[in-house]
Every structure is written in structure tokens, then in C-alpha cells.
């Protein structure tokens, strides 16, 4: 059975939650779950590497970008998959085009979106809290009449997408 590494970075905890949900669905497999800065994050000893991160202000969270840059040559020899969390899941394809090189995207067995969250209380800085509150209010208030915009919903973590991704991993790890 192949060894799987799930490596991620999180700022507000949403990516950690999603990574843990994925990990929990892989019982019976040899899986390591860790952050990008952990010693176990070295992908050399693994067959399959899953990299997760969030989109913040249109960019991949910096620790994940740094991890991809540092380990690019090693990752090129592995089966890799990616998951993102973002406030606007409908834009995930656009985000992947911006955050991965063409080669990274082509090599991936999956480019998934695990949804996202906009929870101002989880934000660390006052600026982030303010931006999240404005974005949530924009979605919920959406117009002059105060009704929720019909074309937008508050994002949540997608357990369905996580389950699909876990299914792919189970097949690959045989």
C-alpha cells in the first residue's frame, strides 16, 4: 500500500478542519497529516502527496506557496493532488490557474475545492475581521432591500467534495 502525505497550511483553521476531515476518511491507509512547516512535511518518503491551502485576497496562502517552491523537484516525481479552500468556490478554476504552474496542474491527479468559510471571529487581525464581515454582509445583504443575493451563498466546507477526493486517494493508494 502506498504512503500518503497530507500537508497544509492554515491561517484561520478552515484548512486544518478540511485536512482533518480528509484524513479521517482514509482509515486503514498509511497517512501522515501535518502542516507545511512540520519535519514530517518532507515529501521524499511518500508515494502520494496532497497539498492543501486557502486563497487569501486572491493568492495562495504564503506557506503553501513556499512549500511548493521548495519541494517542486521532489513533487514532480510523486502523485500529487491539491485542495483549496476559498470564499468564492465558483472561482476555484481561476485560482488554480493563478497559483499552480502548468506542469503542477497537469501532473495533479486532482484539483479540488473543499469549499471555504467566512467566519470573522476566526480571523486573527482586525483588518481580516473587517474584510470578512464586509464580504459576508455583501452576500447576505446583497442589495438595497436587504435580501440575500440569490446568486451568492455563504461558503461552507464541502464534505461531499472531501469524500470524492478521499475516494480518489483510496483508489490511488492500492
Language-model segments: residues:
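A short, aliphatic-rich alpha-helical micro-motif
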Residues: 43-44, 75
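A short, well-structured beta->alpha microelement
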Residues: 29-41
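Structural motif
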Residues: 47-48, 79
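Acidic/glycine-enriched edge-of-secondary-structure segments
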Residues: 18-30, 48-58
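Structured loop/turn residues at beta-strand edges in well-structured enzyme cores
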Residues: 2, 44, 106
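N-terminal beta1-alpha1 ligand-phosphate binding loop
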Residues: 2-27
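Structural beta-sheet core signal
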Residues: 5-6, 33, 51, 81-84, ...
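FMN-binding flavodoxin-like domain, especially the glycine-rich phosphate-binding loop
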Residues: 25, 29, 57-174
Amino acid at each position: 500500500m502506498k504512503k500518503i502525505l497530507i500537508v497544509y497550511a492554515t491561517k484561520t483553521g478552515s484548512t486544518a478542519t478540511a485536512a482533518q476531515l480528509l484524513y479521517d476518511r482514509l482509515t486503514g491507509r498509511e497517512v501522515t497529516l501535518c502542516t507545511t512547516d512540520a519535519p514530517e512535511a518532507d515529501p521524499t518518503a511518500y508515494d502520494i502527496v496532497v497539498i492543501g491551502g486557502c486563497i487569501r485576497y486572491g493568492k495562495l496562502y504564503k506557506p503553501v506557496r513556499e512549500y511548493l517552491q521548495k519541494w517542486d523537484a521532489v513533487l514532480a516525481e510523486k502523485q500529487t493532488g491539491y485542495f483549496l479552500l476559498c470564499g468564492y468556490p465558483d472561482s476555484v478554476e481561476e485560482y488554480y490557474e493563478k497559483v499552480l504552474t502548468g506542469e503542477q496542474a497537469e501532473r495533479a491527479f486532482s484539483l479540488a475545492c473543499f469549499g471555504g468559510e467566512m467566519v470573522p471571529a476566526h480571523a486573527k487581525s482586525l483588518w481580516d475581521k473587517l474584510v470578512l464581515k464586509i464580504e459576508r454582509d455583501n452576500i447576505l445583504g446583497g442589495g438595497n432591500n436587504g435580501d440575500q443575493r440569490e446568486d451568492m451563498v455563504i461558503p461552507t466546507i464541502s464534505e461531499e467534495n472531501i469524500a470524492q477526493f478521499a475516494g480518489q486517494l483510496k483508489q490511488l493508494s492500492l
